[in-house]
Amino acid sequence: MARNEIRPIVKLRSTAGTGYTYVTRKNRRNDPDRMVLRKYDPVVRKHVDFREER
């Protein structure tokens, strides 16, 4: 398997509706579902959920 198949680059978009995104990698074997992380959104100046975008 190629490196990019196991750990693809994914975009995490803010659920606050600001359009702010984080870019990260994820392991498909450990996390086959869409990722949801609670991170800081500087537009609203709060911690909000960021969901994986495909």
UniProtKB/Swiss-Prot annotation:
One example GO MF annotation:
structural constituent of ribosome
Write the record's keywords in alphabetical order, separated by commas. Answer: Ribonucleoprotein, Ribosomal protein
A Pfam family (short name) is Ribosomal_L33
List, in alphabetical order, the GO biological process terms annotated in this UniProt record. translation
Superkingdom of this entry's organism? Bacteria
GO CC annotations, alphabetized: cytosolic large ribosomal subunit
Could you say which protein family the record assigns here?
Belongs to the bacterial ribosomal protein bL33 family.
- Matching PANTHER family, A to Z? 54S RIBOSOMAL PROTEIN L39, MITOCHONDRIAL, LARGE RIBOSOMAL SUBUNIT PROTEIN BL33M
NCBIfam families tied to this protein? PRK00595.1, rpmG_bact
Stated name of the protein: Large ribosomal subunit protein bL33A
Q: Which species is this UniProt entry from?
A: Mycobacteroides abscessus (strain ATCC 19977 / DSM 44196 / CCUG 20993 / CIP 104536 / JCM 13569 / NCTC 13031 / TMC 1543 / L948) (Mycobacterium abscessus)
